[in-house]
C-alpha cells in the first residue's frame, strides 16, 4: 500500500511521459502502477545490435529487452524498442560527457540512458519514470551477498561512521538498514544524478519512483533483515523478497521467476577486468 501510494503520487503529471523499462523487478513494478493512472505514457526499452565485444559478450542484456517487450504486450502498454548500435557508443558517450561533465560509471551504462532519453525527447516526453534506487531500499544488489559474511556489517558501518556525511541519528540499531542507508547515500545518489542529468540535457524531468520520502522513511523504520529474506535458487542478496513475493500480484511471472540479476548496462565487454581497469585509470 505504501509503495503503490508513493509511486502514484510521484507519477502524477499532465505531461507526456515515458518509462525506461528493463526485464527487472524494479522498473516493472513502477510500470504495473503507472499504466493504470490514465497517463500519456510510452515505454522505452533498450535493445542491442548483434555485434561482438572485444573480449566477451554479456548477452543477458539482450534477453532483458525481450522480457520487457513481453511485459508491455501482456499489459497492452505502448512501447518502443530503441536499438543501441555498438558503432555509436563512442559518439553517444562523448555527447553525454560533454553535456553533463560528470564521469559517472562507464560507457556501457551511460549510453543506454543517453539514447533512450534522446528518443523519448524526440517523441515529446517531458517526464521520465525509472525504477532507480529500489535496490538501496528493498535490497537486490550483488554485493548484498557480503552482508552475511562474519564481521562485514560491523566493519562497514564503522567505516561509514568515520565520514561526516553519514547520519549519527538513525532508526534504531539495525545493521541491515544501516548498510542499505549507506547504499542510498552513495550508489543511489550517483545513479539518480546520472539519470537526472541525462534527461535534463533533453529538457525532461526524471522521477525515480521508489524515492517518495514517506515510503523511504517507512522502509527504514521497519526490520531490515525482513527485506533480506532469501531463496536457495537465487544468488544471496539478490532475491528482493518485498517485490518478488509481497508484491507478487503486481509483477508478471516471467519477471518474478527470472533468477539472474542483470542490472542495466550494455553487452559489449561489460565488467571485463581489462575495461574495469581502464575505467579506474581514467
Where are these regions (language model features)?
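Hydrophobic, amphipathic alpha-helical faces that serve as interaction scaffolds
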Residues: 256, 261-281
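ATP-dependent adenylate-handling active sites, centered on carboxylate activation for C-N bond formation
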Residues: 1-250, 265-274
Amino acid at each position: 500500500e505504501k509503495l503503490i501510494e508513493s509511486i502514484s503520487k510521484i507519477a502524477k503529471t499532465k505531461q507526456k511521459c515515458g518509462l525506461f523499462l528493463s526485464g527487472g523487478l524494479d522498473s516493472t513494478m513502477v510500470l504495473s502502477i503507472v499504466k493504470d493512472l490514465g497517463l500519456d505514457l510510452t515505454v522505452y526499452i533498450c535493445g542491442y545490435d548483434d555485434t561482438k565485444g572485444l573480449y566477451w559478450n554479456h548477452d543477458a542484456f539482450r534477453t532483458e529487452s525481450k522480457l520487457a517487450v513481453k511485459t508491455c504486450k501482456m499489459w497492452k502498454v505502448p512501447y518502443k524498442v530503441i536499438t543501441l548500435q555498438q558503432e555509436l557508443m563512442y559518439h553517444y558517450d562523448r555527447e553525454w560527457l560533454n553535456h553533463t561533465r560528470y564521469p559517472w560509471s562507464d560507457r556501457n551504462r551511460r549510453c543506454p540512458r543517453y539514447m533512450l532519453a534522446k528518443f523519448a525527447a524526440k517523441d515529446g516526453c517531458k517526464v521520465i519514470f525509472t525504477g532507480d534506487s529500489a535496490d538501496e531500499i528493498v535490497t537486490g544488489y550483488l554485493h548484498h551477498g557480503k552482508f552475511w559474511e562474519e564481521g562485514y556489517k560491523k566493519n562497514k558501518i564503522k567505516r561509514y561512521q568515520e565520514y561526516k556525511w553519514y547520519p549519527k541519528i538513525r532508526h534504531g540499531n539495525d545493521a541491515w538498514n544501516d548498510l542499505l542507508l549507506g547504499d542510498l547515500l552513495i550508489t543511489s545518489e550517483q545513479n539518480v544524478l546520472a539519470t537526472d542529468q541525462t534527461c535534463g540535457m533533453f529538457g525532461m524531468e526524471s522521477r525515480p519512483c521508489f524515492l517518495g520520502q514517506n515510503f523511504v522513511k517507512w522502509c527504514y523504520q521497519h526490520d531490515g533483515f525482513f527485506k533480506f529474506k532469501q531463496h536457495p535458487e537465487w544468488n544471496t542478496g539478490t532475491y528482493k523478497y518485498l517485490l518478488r513475493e509481497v508484491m507478487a500480484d503486481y509483477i508478471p511471472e516471467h519477471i518474478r521467476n527470472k533468477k539472474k540479476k542483470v542490472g542495466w548496462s550494455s553487452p559489449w565487454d561489460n565488467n571485463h577486468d581489462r575495461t574495469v581497469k581502464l575505467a579506474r585509470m581514467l
